[in-house]
C-alpha cells in the first residue's frame, strides 16, 4: 500500500500510536485522532513511557488530537468534532483506521462442533495484547 506524505490515523490506541510513530520516522506528517483523553492507553506501563518519549522526539511530524471524534471520511481526509463540539476538517493523502477491534465470537463458536476440546482464546474472546493472547493459547493447549 502506498502511503501518502500527509497521513491521518483515526484511533490512538497502541496500534494507532505505534503506526503514527513509524510513519513519522519515515518522514510523513501524521495527525493522530483519539476520542479518549490520551493516546496509547492500552500500552503496558513499561512500553508506554518509551513510546511517548519517541513521539515527543518526533513532535514536528506528529500532531495528536485527543477528545476528538471522527464523524466522516472522504477522499481528501476526515471530518471530526473536538471536545468543544467544533467541527474540524483534516486533509490527508492517506487515512488509516485504527479505531479498535471487536471480537468475532460467532465465527469462533461456529467451530465448536468440530472438536470436543474446543477452546476460545485470543481476540475471539476479547481484543488484547499479543502476550495475553499467546499465554491464553498456551494455557488452553495445556488443558487438552
Indicate residue ranges for each PLM-predicted region.
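Short, conserved glycine- and acidic-residue-centered signature motifs
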Residues: 16, 44, 48, 133
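A Rossmann-like FAD-binding core segment of flavoenzymes
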Residues: 1-5, 25-110
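Basic side chains
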Residues: 28, 48, 125-128, 135
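Acidic-residue sensor for enzyme active/binding pockets
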Residues: 18, 34, 136
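Glycine-rich dinucleotide-binding loop and its adjacent helix/turn
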Residues: 1-26, 112-129
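An active-site-proximal "capping" alpha-helix that borders the catalytic cofactor pocket
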Residues: 132-144
